């Protein structure tokens, strides 16, 4: 996806304002879900923080193990990477962030990564958040 260039005629009919507002709403949702997870699903006492980075211009991410997905949690960095241009829109983005958040919580609790548990958690967060 490229960037949208506002044309002079767009400024006249208010389209530029709509584009800017849409972008702000998406950003609020994107970071809002991270804030929501931090508040309602924190790690166990004594665990560090996890950083969540949205990779603009990417629709998928290759994990350290070579697998391709929309997001990945990298334990040594305690960092979650999310493809910012993933298909499926807002719901898919929220689901992906929550899925990787669950893997981080599993890591913090010294639990094995459980994909089914992460998927169930992601669905729960989508229902709670939207």
Feature map (PLM): residue ranges:
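N-terminal amphipathic/basic-hydrophobic helices that include classical n-h-c signal peptides
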Residues: 1-22
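Auxiliary, metal-adjacent structural segments of Zn-dependent hydrolase domains
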Residues: 18-81, 130
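Hydrophobic (often cysteine-bearing) scaffold residues that line and stabilize catalytic clefts
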Residues: 29, 94, 114, 118
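Short pre-active-site segment immediately N-terminal to the catalytic Zn-binding motif
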Residues: 80-96
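Active-site recognition of the HExxH zinc-binding catalytic motif
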Residues: 95-107
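Post-HExxH zinc-binding segment in Zn-dependent metallohydrolases
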Residues: 111-130
């Amino acid at each position: 996806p490229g960037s949208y260039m506002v044309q002079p005629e767009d400024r006249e009919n208010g389209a530029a304002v709509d584009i800017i507002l849409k972008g702000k709403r998406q950003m609020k949702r994107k970071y809002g879900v991270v804030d929501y997870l931090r508040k309602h699903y924190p790690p166990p006492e004594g665990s560090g923080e996890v950083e969540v980075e949205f990779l603009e211009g990417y629709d998928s991410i290759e994990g350290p193990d070579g697998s391709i997905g929309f997001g990945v949690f990298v334990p040594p960095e305690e960092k979650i990477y999310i493809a910012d241009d993933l298909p499926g829109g807002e719901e898919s983005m929220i689901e992906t962030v929550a899925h990787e958040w669950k893997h981080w919580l599993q890591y913090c609790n010294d639990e094995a990564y459980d994909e089914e548990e992460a998927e169930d958690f992601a669905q729960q967060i989508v229902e709670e958040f939207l």
